Amino acid sequence: MNLNDTFAAVQAAGRHLALLPDDRINQILNAVAEAALEQTSYILSENRKDLERMSPDNPKYDRLRLTEERLRGIASDIRNVATLPSPLGRILKESIRPNGMRLTKISVPFGVIGIIYEARPNVSFDVFSLCLKSGNACILKGGSDADYSNRAIVEVIHQVLRQFNIDTHMVELLPADREATRELLHATGYVDLIIPRGSSALINFVRQNATIPVIETGAGICHTYFDEYGDTAKGAAIIHNAKTRRVSVCNALDCVIVHESRLSDLPLLCEKLKADKVIIYADPSAYQALEGHYPAGLLKPATPESFGTEFLDYKMAIKTVNSFENALGHIQEYSSRHSESIVTENPERAALFTRMVDAACVYTNVSTAFTDGAQFGLGAEIGISTQKLHARGPMGLEEITSYKWIIEGDGQTRQ
């Protein structure tokens, strides 16, 4: 397989995007949103073909599944992107040097962005809308689990692009096989940035094999620390929401850390989890506090593997600590640097937590479920970065632009 011709076509299409006015881009985005709704039956029928090949018990199943409601949400997100100001051509810095040169630093597209993702067909729409709005061409490399869905979505997008006389190569879907992934990771000279979205195994593979820049959107091993000064009602609501709102996403709660002085509150903190049949892997102290108060079939002794696991399922761990410092230590050891939360009524404790915890998103008395581009007012997200360069946290339009310097003068030469 040689995809260089495909990569070159995407690159060429990307150069023309820079010439599209923002109002034209917004028209295209709104048309794609409308097409997604008009072709709901087609998209869902193709999605069902993917679902039929996967067990409903697979943690990826919920991510893979599209519904009419989810497609309405996707269309709404695309329309929201259209309402956002263009991230391009913004003056980031300007100055006049002593010799009269005028320097202007302006935002520009990356060029071509490659996205490697697994069983999440909604990503195809998200990536397209953000890349179009930011003037980037995009190469989609979806997993085989979602191949029917991704092909249907890209076909819907291409239909709209053709209506607007836009080169359809601006969004290209690669074959769903590993050889295509390897070629994409080595597309030096064609692709400017790779963003992997998926399991830690996928992200590690991309990091270890790519010869072009990568922004990691790491696994979400998320903790909520119920502090000795925590409010029980708030804690119960936050834990339930963070764990059960949607278990298959990266901002879902994986481990509750509880101060030993509040072990007697554990039954109340976990009460709402019973209805969702959440399996709890509890350390000895937490197990003893929950025994007789939580269904025996759902309460398991924790093992070393219980901590540091992204469950993506109706499962979570509980760790007991005897100090705030030990809570920080546990997070430091097991966190994926995605989203961490504290439940406390002590302002000093909250401030110290936000300063000391090294994560992209740090919450005080808030569910980690809010780590999301739309919730942050970004319209949508191309991923949630857990690294510190070039972006961190939910990545919206600004995070998928770069910049260049424009230098204007009147014949200046350097001595």
Curated annotation (Swiss-Prot):
GO MF, one example: glutamate-5-semialdehyde dehydrogenase activity
Gene: proA
UniProt name for this protein: Gamma-glutamyl phosphate reductase
Job of this protein: Catalyzes the NADPH-dependent reduction of L-glutamate 5-phosphate into L-glutamate 5-semialdehyde and phosphate. The product spontaneously undergoes cyclization to form 1-pyrroline-5-carboxylate.
PROSITE patterns: PROA
Keyword Membrane: no
Protein location: Cytoplasm
Pathway the protein contributes to: Amino-acid biosynthesis; L-proline biosynthesis; L-glutamate 5-semialdehyde from L-glutamate: step 2/2
Lineage: Bacteria, Pseudomonadati, Bacteroidota, Bacteroidia, Bacteroidales
Keyword hit for Oxidoreductase: yes
Reactions this protein catalyses: L-glutamate 5-semialdehyde + phosphate + NADP(+) = L-glutamyl 5-phosphate + NADPH + H(+)
UniProt keyword annotations, A-Z: Amino-acid biosynthesis, Cytoplasm, NADP, Oxidoreductase, Proline biosynthesis
The protein's Enzyme Commission number: 1.2.1.41
